[in-house]
Amino acid sequence: MGDPEVLLEVYEVIRNRIEERPEGSYVAELTEDDDTKPAINKICEKIIEESGELILAAKDGDREGVVYESTDLIFHVLVLLAYLGIEIGEVFDEFERRRK
């Protein structure tokens, strides 16, 4: 099984890309307002898209597709959290609170 620490690493990379905005960065582009859409709309639309793809993969019994689309969905949720300034630790804390 993979190391769950990778979520923290990916989150930090996302935060860094939002802050430093390197040219050619997908995250930097996604989290920047443009002439047609505010960044929050672009991020939320990606979450909707990835959710739908995950649901279809699950419905089709596509195990690899579920893993792939889950990764895409989680990635975009991490982008949303970072964009909104929500630390991933806050989500972990909520999981711990609910576990009790």
Swiss-Prot record:
Location in the cell: Cytoplasm
Catalyzed reaction equations: 1-(5-phospho-beta-D-ribosyl)-ATP + H2O = 1-(5-phospho-beta-D-ribosyl)-5'-AMP + diphosphate + H(+)
One GO molecular-function entry: ATP binding
Enzyme class at the top of the EC tree: hydrolase
Keyword terms of this UniProt record: Amino-acid biosynthesis, ATP-binding, Cytoplasm, Histidine biosynthesis, Hydrolase, Nucleotide-binding
Listed GO CC annotations: cytoplasm
The protein's name: Phosphoribosyl-ATP pyrophosphatase
